[in-house]
Swiss-Prot record:
Annotated Gene3D superfamilies: Aldolase class I
Gene this chain is encoded by: trpA
Organism superkingdom: Bacteria
BP GO annotations: L-tryptophan biosynthetic process
The protein's name in its UniProt record: Tryptophan synthase alpha chain
Pathway(s) this gene product operates in, as recorded in its UniProt entry: Amino-acid biosynthesis; L-tryptophan biosynthesis; L-tryptophan from chorismate: step 5/5
């Protein structure tokens, strides 16, 4: 199978540049504004879009993304509405890859088979499920692959050479390397450590390696993108969104632009990595 993710990374490889991957929470701060923001991302330079599935117990998320999930849940966001959001995005954009990121519980409650059918028909390309290890591939990973979706796995600084083959075995689309141990948004990524880690992962796989956690500025994005096939930014974009809201946590006239402008700035950083290499 070839997905939009595979096509996008092949296109970028031909251009000799890394992907800029954005993360935002579905339904933050409300479903309508969320769709407007996500539609603005590709125009601002996003190559791949990760969309968080709001969940009440997000153990890997830092305070910013946890708060985004709570705002979305308060606004009535559900997994069904998250798929509707993707469907709405696909009306105008059939090329930009969409990855849903989150936890297994909401999918399990929705029903795995139903979810996979609905996700595929909505226009989802891949899944990142942070609390399903390789030992549980039968639960969702293998059915997702059969349904034509990429299953993207996380590798971390503590994933050693003994563990890495198991992590990579059924991974497709790309590998998501978590550059720091801990929760999202905690610290800055170290580009020299990232360089070594990406090289180590690439000894085990031909898949693109994207790096996330700890990228907040165009400078860091550029440094990371020079070592990896993609740089993922989430917390910084979620913070820009939050800082544009009114005192009651509602969207303002500035909200969409606040996220779009930071996206454009970070995208320039990622694209600068290619120019620096030339």
């Amino acid at each position: 199978m070839t997905t939009r993710i595979d096509i996008r990374f092949a296109e970028l490889a031909k251009q000799g540049r890394s992907a800029f991957v954005t993360f935002l929470m579905a339904g933050d701060p409300d479903p309508a504004t969320s769709l407007e923001i996500i539609k603005a991302l590709p125009k601002s330079g996003a190559d791949v879009i990760e969309i968080g599935m709001p969940f009440t117990d997000p153990m890997a998320d830092g305070p910013s993304i946890q708060a985004a999930g709570l705002r979305a849940l308060k606004a009535g966001m559900t997994l069904k509405k998250t798929l509707e959001l993707v469907r709405g995005f696909r009306k105008d954009d059939n090329a930009t890859p969409i990855v849903l990121m989150g936890y297994y519980n909401p999918i399990y409650i929705y029903g795995v088979d139903k979810f996979l059918v609905d996700a595929k028909s909505a226009g989802v390309d891949g899944l990142i499920i942070v609390d399903l290890p390789p030992e549980e591939d039968d639960e969702l990973c293998l059915p997702a692959m059969k349904a034509g979706l990429n299953f993207i796995r996380l590798a971390t600084p503590t994933t050693d050479d003994k563990r890495l083959p198991a992590v990579l075995a059924n991974t497709s689309g790309f590998v998501y390397y978590v550059s720091i141990t801990g929760i999202t948004g905690a610290a800055a990524a170290d580009s020299s450590a990232v360089s070594e880690a990406v090289a180590r992962i690439k000894r085990h796989t031909k898949l693109p390696v994207c790096v996330g956690f700890g990228i907040r500025t165009p400078e860091t994005a550029r440094a990371i993108a020079s070592h990896a096939n993609g740089a993922v930014v989430g917390t910084a974009l979620v913070d820009a969104l939050k800082n544009s809201l009114d005192a009651d946590g509602r969207a303002t006239a500035k909200t969409v632009n606040a996220v779009a402008e930071l996206t454009a700035s970070l995208a320039q950083g990622v694209k600068g990595a290619q120019q620096a290499a030339e």
